[in-house]
Amino acid sequence: MDSSTANSSGTAISKAEWKPDQSSLECNDCQLPFTLIRRRHHCRKCGSIFCDSCSSFYSILPIEYGYTGQQRLCRSCNNSFEQKKQYFETDALVAQFQLRSTAQFEYSKPLQDIGHTKHGLRKSYCMAKNSMGGGEECVVSIITPTPSSCPWSMSNEKKKRKFEKTLLSLKHPYILTPINVEVSGANDKILVIRTFFKQGSLRDQVYKSKPLSPYDTKYIYKQPKSSSSSSSSSSSSSQSQSVLPIKSIQKYCKQILESLLYLKSKGIQFSHLHLSNILINQSNDTCQLVDIENCLLGMKPLFNDYIYGIGLPQSFKDNLEVICFGHCLFEMIIGIPLGDHSNINSFIPLFPDKVFLLLQQIFSEKTPTLEELVKNPWFEVTTTIEQQSLQNGKLKKSQLTFIKDNSNKFESPKVSLSGSFSSSNISKLSSSSSNNNSNNNNNNNNNSNTFNNISSNDDKRKSMKLPSSTSLLNNSFNLSNNNNPSSPSTSTISPNSSLISSPPKTPILQTFTPPPPPPPPKSAPPPPPPPSSSKLPPSSSSRNSLLESIRNADNAKKLKKTTPNTKPKSSIGPHSLKPSSTKKK
């Protein structure tokens, strides 16, 4: 299978390299060995080998991956892909509603994950059009700062306004100031709108990639084809590896250093410096820094794990911008990321003159400062900075204090717990815990003393066992009976009486395990039987005669004689009212 394909836009995208079947004898997920029945299957995203049950997930990958239709994915790739997909969809909806509220910008389309994977699920991008700027295209960064990472509260309206004004006030010729900043408090998202440069970033220029392609597919180092001759000079190899002209590298480096000095003068140590955060402005042939807001939102830098690693000198942590600048310089010349700083010794033949000595100076134990690095003769390139732009970049005192309080507050367990476990809170907790421990110790000592005084010499074993049980009971009841002075006095009672009175076990057992309900009493009357003749009302002569007439047809005459007896009972009827009314008249 060919490792590279071309999408509809004409950009070459490298697929994930499939591992050979012989390289894995068991599934990478369930660790079960492969057999004739349990066959090998490759994940289309990562290229690893799994069994059928561990890779039975199908999803449609973006066209940049070079596949069409649903493709087989492993469990981890499917979860991350679906999670990012849902996250991007929600961010796109938030951006649509937020941009619709402003009459200046119009939502165009969502973008793939063009940012670095270090941001995880906290950053996505979309395209918009500036209606007031002649319909120019803009890139909208949708940031979701987590509560543990953001040093200021998103629910504070004053902090929101201060963040917007501070970010818009940072103006410099080599810093791309946002056009607008929108804070969506309902969704805890921040929208930073910038001008879109078709040339992309410096990393796009190094890797010759499209700016809007996914991050994990466009930055793939491709080693140039070696010549037929086995021997090659160092000059020819340096020319093949130097992807950018040396003069352009010198000019860009000088501009980057000047922008870093401006940010340092405002109190921002821009540790988020890498080639993806340096855009190329072709109109005036300059480079401009972006994503300055990352320093004010507590997001981790790209080189955070490397700089704060074990065994690195303290000068690396004190000069974060210089270390990041050294990584950028190495990648602009060689064309691949540096990784560990000791790797520069492996590329000595590829460096131009004085560059290797400069990198050695940057990654030494005594790292130079920005002011010392700018004075290096290798950066002596004429650059003009307008004085008006520097005047526009001045900040107010309130904005400088906001930067001082919130800049470079990286997300870490210590930083996230600083609000709840401050020094004052720790002192309060320690004092309260010491008081509780002292009270408990005093109670235990009092209990043991009383029992030791009461117990006799012959009954030492019993007296040694009693304090442990009663002290536990007293400690448990002291929490609920702090205001009752009689509760601790139970320890002065004799051991036999304390054992009976102190543990209230019988009511607890009665409440939780009640006796079974008593059986129904025997004297209770049984359910009523069907009505019998004994309980019927007394029979009347009319009824008896009626029954006899039913039985014997000869009793019809008797029924006629007994009918007058029933008339007084029916005197209440409506016919009896007529004669009474006539008498009154």
UniProtKB/Swiss-Prot annotation:
<feature type="domain" description="Protein kinase">
    <location>
        <begin position="108"/>
        <end position="478"/>
    </location>
</feature>
<dbReference type="GO" id="GO:0003779">
    <property type="term" value="F:actin binding"/>
</dbReference>
<feature type="binding site">
    <location>
        <position position="74"/>
    </location>
    <ligand>
        <name>Zn(2+) 2</name>
    </ligand>
</feature>
<feature type="compositionally biased region" description="Low complexity">
    <location>
        <begin position="426"/>
        <end position="456"/>
    </location>
</feature>
<feature type="binding site">
    <location>
        <position position="30"/>
    </location>
    <ligand>
        <name>Zn(2+) 1</name>
    </ligand>
</feature>
<dbReference type="Pfam" id="PF01363">
    <property type="entry name" value="FYVE"/>
</dbReference>
<feature type="compositionally biased region" description="Pro residues">
    <location>
        <begin position="513"/>
        <end position="532"/>
    </location>
</feature>
<feature type="zinc finger region" description="FYVE-type">
    <location>
        <begin position="21"/>
        <end position="82"/>
    </location>
</feature>
<feature type="binding site">
    <location>
        <position position="43"/>
    </location>
    <ligand>
        <name>Zn(2+) 2</name>
    </ligand>
</feature>
<feature type="domain" description="WH2">
    <location>
        <begin position="542"/>
        <end position="562"/>
    </location>
</feature>
<protein>
    <recommendedName>
        <fullName>Probable inactive serine/threonine-protein kinase slob1</fullName>
    </recommendedName>
</protein>
<feature type="binding site">
    <location>
        <position position="51"/>
    </location>
    <ligand>
        <name>Zn(2+) 1</name>
    </ligand>
</feature>
<dbReference type="InterPro" id="IPR003124">
    <property type="entry name" value="WH2_dom"/>
</dbReference>
<feature type="compositionally biased region" description="Low complexity">
    <location>
        <begin position="466"/>
        <end position="503"/>
    </location>
</feature>
<dbReference type="GO" id="GO:0004672">
    <property type="term" value="F:protein kinase activity"/>
</dbReference>
<comment type="similarity">
    <text>Belongs to the protein kinase superfamily. Ser/Thr protein kinase family.</text>
</comment>
<dbReference type="InterPro" id="IPR013083">
    <property type="entry name" value="Znf_RING/FYVE/PHD"/>
</dbReference>
<dbReference type="InterPro" id="IPR011009">
    <property type="entry name" value="Kinase-like_dom_sf"/>
</dbReference>
<keyword id="KW-0479">Metal-binding</keyword>
<feature type="binding site">
    <location>
        <position position="46"/>
    </location>
    <ligand>
        <name>Zn(2+) 2</name>
    </ligand>
</feature>
<feature type="region of interest" description="Disordered">
    <location>
        <begin position="426"/>
        <end position="585"/>
    </location>
</feature>
<dbReference type="InterPro" id="IPR000306">
    <property type="entry name" value="Znf_FYVE"/>
</dbReference>
<dbReference type="InterPro" id="IPR011011">
    <property type="entry name" value="Znf_FYVE_PHD"/>
</dbReference>
<keyword id="KW-0863">Zinc-finger</keyword>
<keyword id="KW-0862">Zinc</keyword>
<dbReference type="GO" id="GO:0008270">
    <property type="term" value="F:zinc ion binding"/>
</dbReference>
<keyword id="KW-0009">Actin-binding</keyword>
<feature type="binding site">
    <location>
        <position position="54"/>
    </location>
    <ligand>
        <name>Zn(2+) 1</name>
    </ligand>
</feature>
<feature type="compositionally biased region" description="Low complexity">
    <location>
        <begin position="533"/>
        <end position="542"/>
    </location>
</feature>
<feature type="binding site">
    <location>
        <position position="77"/>
    </location>
    <ligand>
        <name>Zn(2+) 2</name>
    </ligand>
</feature>
<dbReference type="InterPro" id="IPR017455">
    <property type="entry name" value="Znf_FYVE-rel"/>
</dbReference>
<feature type="binding site">
    <location>
        <position position="27"/>
    </location>
    <ligand>
        <name>Zn(2+) 1</name>
    </ligand>
</feature>
<dbReference type="InterPro" id="IPR001245">
    <property type="entry name" value="Ser-Thr/Tyr_kinase_cat_dom"/>
</dbReference>
<dbReference type="Pfam" id="PF07714">
    <property type="entry name" value="PK_Tyr_Ser-Thr"/>
</dbReference>
